[in-house]
Design a protein with these regions (language model features):
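Cytochrome P450 catalytic-domain "roof"
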Residues: 79
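Ordered, amphipathic secondary-structure segments that act as subunit-interaction surfaces
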Residues: 83-97
Length: 237
């Protein structure tokens, strides 16, 4: 069971529609974010919606007032009786390119917000770890959280034992398809700098807590060859 706020109202997600003329369908133009609700409270809501706004700007989508209205939409949705799993769920706000393509600018976007249960947490993955598939390609537009995941999904297509791809352009490890990547090397936590990767909200919190607790953090791209000597590696999203 999931609900969606679209065209000014909440309704079951399966009843919601986008016109086939929308640039999200025609050209893959759209941005989104993923926000966890815990007991009807959104985790880092302001930070996620600010990133959504910056993603939209980076994609050339006009966002006048849309993101600000999403604050109220998400808070209202979290209070609803039909909010999935009693308010412990995943919220995904989307902004699409709409129907108008003005020389690569999109002045009339559409927006909607989905509330869904989200994937279950797999305890076994936290015990044994996950497999990532290195790929030499670079993520397209790393500062834009685009709805278009096709390029990244192709890198690990058909690999049922792999969680997702690990971008390693030129042998430098940047991030995975959906997560920030960290390696513990020589007593330091090493992770790619903002500019090379999407500004992960959880990433920023992890780095802040690490520094506050005496860990040395180095913001650079670890080399793929260095991972063989890493004490450990982990991802966040």
């Amino acid at each position: 069971m999931s609900i969606c706020f679209i065209d000014g109202a909440f309704r079951p997600t399966e009843e919601c529609r986008l016109p086939v003329t929308d640039m999200a369908i025609q050209r893959g133009v759209g941005v989104f974010d993923s926000i966890r609700l815990y007991d009807r409270k959104a985790f880092a809501l302001s930070e996620h919606l600010e990133r959504l706004k910056e993603s939209a700007k980076g994609a050339g989508i006009r966002v006048d007032g849309i993101v600000e209205r999403m604050f109220d939409t998400i808070r209202e949705g979290a209070r609803r009786d039909d909010c999935p799993n009693e308010g412990n769920c995943l919220v995904k706000p989307y902004i699409t390119g709409g129907d108008v393509n003005d020389c690569g600018r999109f002045p009339e976007p559409r927006h909607f917000v989905i509330f869904e249960e989200g994937p279950p947490i797999c305890a076994e993955e936290y015990k044994t770890g996950v497999a990532l598939q290195p790929t030499s390609v670079e993520r397209l537009h790393p500062l834009v959280k685009s709805t278009n995941y096709l390029f990244g999904l192709m890198q690990s297509a058909g690999m049922s034992d792999v969680l997702e791809c690990l971008y390693c352009p030129g042998g430098e490890v940047t991030e995975t398809l959906r997560s920030s990547f960290f390696a513990c090397l020589g007593g330091k936590i090493v992770t790619a700098p903002i500019g090379r990767v999407l500004g992960g909200i959880t990433r920023n919190i992890v780095l802040k807590l690490a520094r506050e607790n005496g860990f040395t953090v180095e913001e650079r791209c670890p080399l793929l060859t260095e991972l063989l000597s890493a004490n450990e590696a982990f991802i966040t999203k």
